[in-house]
C-alpha cells in the first residue's frame, strides 16, 4: 500500500516559528508583539500545537494570538483551497468570489413607501478598483430618496478606501474621517472623503440611518463609526464586533494565511476608535428589528 500525505498536512514547528517572527516584526503594538512571539514559541515547546492538521493548528494558534489583548484581526486563517503565495492575496481571492456572488457588494437596493431607500453594502467593502462602479450605480440610484437606510448588518470588513468613497456620497465637501498611525506611532496615512464622486450624491442634509449587528466588523464598522462621529447618521441595531486595526496577510503554508494588524486608526473627532468596544448604536435594538426601527424613525422624521 502506498501512503500519501494530505495536502493540508503541516509542519507545526516551522509554521509557528514563521508566525512568531512575522508578528514580532509587524504587529502594530511592539510590546504586545514581543509578548506574543514569546508565547507562541513557549506554547510550541510545550507541545500545544502537536497536530498534523493545518485547520486544527490555525484554531489553536489564533486562540493564543488573541489571548494577550483580544485583537480580532490577529489570526492564523485556514483556507480549504490552496492559498496564493503573494502577500495579501489569500483574502483577495476569497473576496473575489464574494464580489461575484453579491452584485459587486450591493445585494439590495430598494425604494420603500414614503420615499425611504434601503441600500445594503456587503458582505465586504470590496477593493475600490472593483467596487467603484457598482457602488456608484447604487448610490446614484438612491440619491433622490427622501431618507436612506444603509444596511451594514452583514458587512464584515474590507477596504478603507471604499469606506471613504461611500462617505463621499453622504457628506458635502471634503471631510477628514480617520488617521492611520504606524507601529512607531507616526502618521502613516489620513483618510478623507474624495473631492469628487461620479454620479449623484445623496448629500449631507437628508435623514440617514445605518444598521449594524454583532457581526459587523472592521471596515464595515468604520463606515458606521465615521458617519456617527461626524454627526451625519444615527446608528440603529447592535454593538458591532470591535476590530479597528488595518491588517496585512502573509502566506505561511499552502493552506494558512497569517493576519496581522499593521496600523491603528484614530478618529479626528473622538481621538480613538472602536477597537474592543465595537460601534455603539444610537438606537439599540436586535439586529433583526433594526430595519423596521430605522424605517419608523425615518417616517416620523419626514412627517
Feature names for model-found ranges:
Residues 2, 30-114, 298, 302-303:
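Extended, small/polar residue-biased N-terminal targeting/export presequences
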Residues 19, 65, 119, 150, ...:
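Terminal peptide-recognition signature
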Residues 80-83, 123-127, 154-160, 176, ...:
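Solvent-exposed loop/turn segments at secondary-structure junctions
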Residues 99, 103-132, 269-270:
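STAS-typified acidic loop motif
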Residues 118-122, 142-157, 211:
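Short acidic catalytic loops
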Residues 127-146:
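A short, well-ordered alpha-helical element
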Residues 157-207, 245-251, 262-264, 268:
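Gly/Ser/Thr-rich loop/hinge elements
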Amino acid at each position: 500500500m502506498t501512503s500519501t500525505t494530505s495536502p493540508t498536512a503541516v509542519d507545526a514547528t516551522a509554521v509557528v516559528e514563521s508566525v512568531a517572527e512575522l508578528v514580532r516584526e509587524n504587529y502594530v503594538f511592539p510590546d504586545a508583539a514581543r509578548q506574543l512571539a514569546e508565547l507562541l514559541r513557549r506554547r510550541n515547546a510545550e507541545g500545544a500545537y502537536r497536530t498534523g492538521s493545518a485547520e486544527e493548528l490555525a484554531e489553536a494558534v489564533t486562540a493564543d494570538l488573541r489571548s494577550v489583548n483580544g485583537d480580532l484581526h490577529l489570526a492564523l486563517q485556514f483556507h480549504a483551497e490552496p492559498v496564493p503565495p503573494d502577500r495579501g492575496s489569500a483574502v483577495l481571492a476569497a473576496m473575489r468570489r464574494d464580489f461575484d456572488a453579491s452584485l459587486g457588494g450591493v445585494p439590495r437596493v430598494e425604494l420603500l413607501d414614503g420615499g425611504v431607500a434601503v441600500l445594503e453594502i456587503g458582505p465586504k467593502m470590496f477593493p475600490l478598483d472593483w467596487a467603484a462602479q457598482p457602488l456608484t450605480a447604487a448610490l446614484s440610484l438612491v440619491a433622490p430618496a427622501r431618507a436612506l437606510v444603509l444596511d451594514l448588518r452583514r458587512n464584515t470588513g474590507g477596504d478603507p478606501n471604499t469606506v471613504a468613497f461611500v462617505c463621499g456620497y453622504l457628506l458635502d465637501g471634503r471631510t477628514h474621517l480617520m488617521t492611520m498611525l504606524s507601529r512607531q506611532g507616526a502618521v502613516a496615512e489620513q483618510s478623507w472623503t474624495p473631492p469628487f464622486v461620479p454620479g449623484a450624491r445623496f448629500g449631507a442634509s437628508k435623514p440617514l440611518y445605518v444598521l449594524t449587528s454583532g457581526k459587523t466588523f472592521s471596515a464595515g464598522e468604520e463606515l458606521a463609526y465615521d458617519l456617527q462621529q461626524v454627526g451625519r447618521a444615527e446608528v440603529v441595531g447592535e454593538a458591532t464586533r470591535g476590530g479597528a486595526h488595518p491588517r496585512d496577510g502573509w502566506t505561511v503554508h499552502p493552506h494558512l494565511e497569517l493576519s496581522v494588524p499593521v496600523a491603528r486608526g484614530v478618529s479626528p473627532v473622538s481621538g480613538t476608535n472602536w477597537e474592543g468596544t465595537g460601534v455603539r448604536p444610537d438606537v439599540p435594538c436586535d439586529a433583526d428589528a433594526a430595519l423596521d426601527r430605522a424605517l419608523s424613525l425615518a417616517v416620523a422624521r419626514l412627517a
